Structures are given as structure tokens and as C-alpha cells.
Regions:
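Membrane-interface soluble catalytic domains
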Residues: 1-275
């Protein structure tokens, strides 16, 4: 993430002069803009073609525009929602490596989330309680290399929604009345691995919806009582982007979405603007 202090941090990086007015929090969370450039030497990347014009043509266009009548305010009954262009753009590799895992304690009737940042840049995570949207969401700043944990008291059901940078998304739905599957998400290069465990006394079935980015799936997995299964999802064809929703009995749901960072340059969200 970049903000107004990112320009100052870029100048610090370039000239070695430290700006004392940039807070420690902004240094942890906001980048210094160096990732927006490619400093590889030699750099043989072709420069993008820009539309050319002349000073005379630009002045002529400005003069014609100044003679136009003001654009009338459109009627509220005729206004349309702007359309988002559905086009992926080149995207630099990002420094984020975020992990969020859940653990249900039936005896204490709590749901705990473990938040971990194994990347090189701090990040802010927002956690919304879908069953109590009137409550202020909990917000956490995770420094690079740090981890923390927090818990929610659950009466019967829970529904938490975690949001982070660059489309990072985790959803946790379930109930306390019965033991339900548990999910652990790990990654290796261009693959995402889901490990599903079943702490219950009976076999459990988990359905995984089709991934809209790669069109893989759907799948149905059977987990024996006290056992676990693993499912691997290649993400290279989608530039690292993934969106997987898992369902089981009793309203159990987990959703994991975002972009898998490998240190390589990729593309922006290819499904941006689509419902």
C-alpha cells in the first residue's frame, strides 16, 4: 500500500536523508514506491507506446473545449452505474505473505483466528462479524514477520469475514453444536494446498466450488473421522489469483481468495468488474 509518505520514503531511499515526521506505523505498512519500478540492469523491457500530439493540436483542443456549454447535471432517473473495464494489467510482485487460520474451542465456545505475516511488508487486516454488522470491525496491523491471535465468543453460530490488501479474503462460517471440519491453507511456489481435518466422530463431506479464475473443480472430498485430506490447486495459469469456497453440513463454510505471491511479477485481478 502507498500513501503520501511513500513519496518521502522514496526520496529517503534515493538520497539517504531520513524524514523524521514519518511514523513507525506508516513505515511498517506503506511502501516506498521502489516496487513500482524495474531497476534490473540491463533492462530490455520495451517502453509502452504513448499517444503523440503537438503543442498546436493541444492548444486547439483546449480552445474548442472552452467554447463548449457546461455539461448539464443528468436526471437521477437516467444515471447509470459506471462500467469497470474487464482487463488485466501487468502487476509488480508484492511483498505480502498473509495467513489466517481458525480454531474452534467447543468447551470454551470461542472461535480463534491466528493471523500471521511472513512477508517483508506490514499489512492491515479488517475482521467483520457478519452476524453483528452493527459492531465496529476489528482491525489489526501485522508487521513483517509477526503474528497475533484473537478470539470471539460464540453462542451458537459464527460468521467472520477477513479482508486484507490486494484482494486477500477469508471467510469463516459454522456452528458450535457439532464438531465440523478444520482448514489449513499453505502455499508453495505456484500451488495452493488445502489441508482439511475432521475432528468429529463420523466421516465428513466437504464440497469445493469451481474456481472462477482457473475453472478447476468442483470437487467433493470425504474426510474420515479423525483423519485429514489434502487438495492442491495450481494457480500459475491465473497469475496466482484464486477464489475457493468450501461447504459442509451444518452451515460450515470457508472461503479463501486472493493472489498467491511468489516473488515474480504477475497481473492485476483478471475478474475485476465482474459480478
Amino acid at each position: 500500500m502507498f500513501d503520501h509518505t511513500s513519496v518521502l520514503q522514496f526520496l529517503e531511499k534515493r538520497f539517504g536523508v531520513r524524514e523524521p515526521n514519518v511514523s513507525a506505523w506508516r513505515r511498517a505498512v506503506c511502501g516506498d514506491l521502489t516496487s513500482a519500478f524495474n531497476f534490473v540492469d540491463p533492462n530490455h523491457e520495451p517502453l509502452p507506446t504513448l499517444q503523440t500530439t503537438t503543442r498546436q493540436a493541444a492548444d486547439s483542443l483546449r480552445q474548442r473545449q472552452e467554447k463548449l456549454l457546461p455539461v448539464p447535471v443528468p436526471s437521477t432517473s437516467k444515471q447509470l452505474v459506471p462500467q469497470q473495464k474487464r482487463l488485466a494489467r501487468p502487476s509488480r510482485a508484492l511483498p505480502y505473505r498473509l495467513h489466517v487460520d481458525s480454531q474452534v474451542d467447543h468447551k470454551a465456545r470461542t472461535l480463534s483466528l491466528s493471523l500471521q505475516n511472513t512477508g517483508t511488508q506490514g499489512a492491515v487486516l479488517h475482521v467483520y462479524d457478519g452476524l453483528h454488522l452493527g459492531d465496529i470491525p476489528r482491525r489489526y496491523t501485522l508487521e513483517a514477520g509477526k503474528a497475533l491471535q484473537d478470539s470471539w465468543t460464540v453462542v451458537e453460530r459464527y460468521q467472520l469475514w477477513v479482508l486484507g490488501p490486494n484482494g486477500f479474503h477469508r471467510s469463516f462460517h459454522g456452528q458450535m453444536q457439532q464438531r465440523q471440519p478444520e482448514l489449513l491453507v499453505t502455499s508453495s511456489q505456484h500451488q495452493l494446498q488445502l489441508t482439511l481435518s475432521n475432528p468429529g466422530g463420523q466421516a465428513a463431506t466437504v464440497s469445493i466450488d469451481r474456481c472462477p479464475y482457473t475453472q478447476q473443480g468442483p470437487w467433493t472430498l470425504s474426510i474420515p473421522a479423525g483423519g485429514e485430506v489434502r487438495q492442491v490447486f495450481p494457480c500459475e495459469s491465473s497469475g496466482g489469483w484464486y477464489d475457493l469456497t468450501l461447504h459442509s453440513d451444518g452451515g460450515w463454510l470457508r472461503r479463501v481468495a486472493g493472489r498467491l505471491e511468489t516473488g515474480e511479477h504477475s497481473i492485476s485481478d483478471p475478474l475485476m468488474g465482474r459480478p
